[in-house]
């Protein structure tokens, strides 16, 4: 990372100054190799995380704990965080800059297409987010929404990026794009649970799985066989509140979670560009989520 001091002069007098921390990297994409960092293919894997990214009992963590967070992420063999719904904090992104963790940064969304003043508000927010974070080398993806938007809106978001971040080497896109005209207008496409992935999309730009392993169980129980639980009952999960055959995401033990994590990651690892399935879809994937707090029940 490098620090540059920017100074503002008026009539020869210094009015203001700011030190900007930034970094340099070359970003590209090859349909047969995936995302390229400094011309080297990089398989992006990691977690989808709420932008609050709080610590259990502490809440919003101090900056040194953000660095602990980043080191733990790296130690888990991950190199990517996708923030969900709204932009991650400056402190988180600064930490990812320091530790080399790729970031997908949204602005804001409504879980669906919106219009009129609501859409203009999202555009204004994306403008502000790009200005605030465009010097952060860890950000490779700007996310225009958590659900599909139309071709005109995608073009509008790309125009903002081209104007305010023309040399950042970043991709502008959206989750659950599934029509060819919008895909052509985007620079990357996000999927959820491997829906809508296709080779023609990967030939256009990166496909990123945005949040597999959407489990929402408390995981208080280690396994089904140790007392006093013996296949514990849940209030809402499964038929009659009992665990069903297969993966019931509302009634997972810690043992179930480990198996589901391996199964989920294996799906996208095999479907990655160059993977064993030969589908050649994915450039990256993110599991939901990296956290030790409630995260809205997740």
Model-identified regions with their sequence ranges:
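N-terminal carbohydrate-binding accessory modules
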Residues: 5-73, 94
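Substrate-binding/catalytic cleft of secreted carbohydrate-active enzymes
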Residues: 64-297
């Amino acid at each position: 990372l490098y620090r540059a001091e920017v100074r503002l002069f008026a009539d020869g007098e210094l009015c203001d100054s700011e030190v900007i921390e930034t970094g340099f990297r070359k970003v590209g994409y090859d349909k047969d190799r995936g995302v390229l960092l400094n011309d080297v293919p990089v398989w992006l894997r990691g977690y989808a995380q709420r932008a609050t990214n709080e610590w259990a009992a502490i809440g919003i963590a101090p900056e040194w704990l953000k660095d602990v967070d980043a080191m733990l992420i790296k130690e888990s063999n991950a190199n990517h965080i996708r923030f969900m719904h709204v932009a991650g904090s400056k402190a988180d992104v600064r930490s990812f800059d320091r530790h080399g963790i790729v970031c997908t940064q949204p602005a804001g969304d409504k879980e669906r297409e919106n219009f009129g003043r609501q859409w203009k508000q999202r555009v204004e927010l994306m403008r502000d987010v790009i200005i605030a974070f465009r010097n952060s080398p860890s950000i490779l993806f700007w996310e225009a929404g958590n659900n599909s938007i139309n071709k005109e809106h995608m073009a509008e978001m790309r125009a903002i990026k081209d104007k305010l971040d023309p040399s950042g080497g970043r991709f502008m896109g959206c989750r659950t794009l599934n029509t060819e005209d919008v895909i052509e207008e985007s620079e990357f496409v996000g999927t959820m649970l491997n829906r809508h992935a296709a080779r023609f999309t990967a030939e256009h730009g990166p496909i990123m799985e945005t949040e597999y392993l959407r489990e929402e169980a408390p995981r208080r129980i280690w396994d089904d066989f140790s007392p006093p639980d013996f296949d514990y009952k849940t209030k809402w999960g499964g038929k009659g509140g009992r665990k069903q055959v297969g993966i019931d995401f509302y009634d997972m033990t810690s043992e179930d979670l480990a198996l589901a994590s391996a199964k989920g990651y294996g799906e996208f690892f095999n479907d990655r560009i160059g993977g064993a399935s030969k589908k050649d879809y994915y450039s990256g994937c993110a599991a939901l989520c990296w956290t030790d707090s409630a995260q809205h029940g997740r």
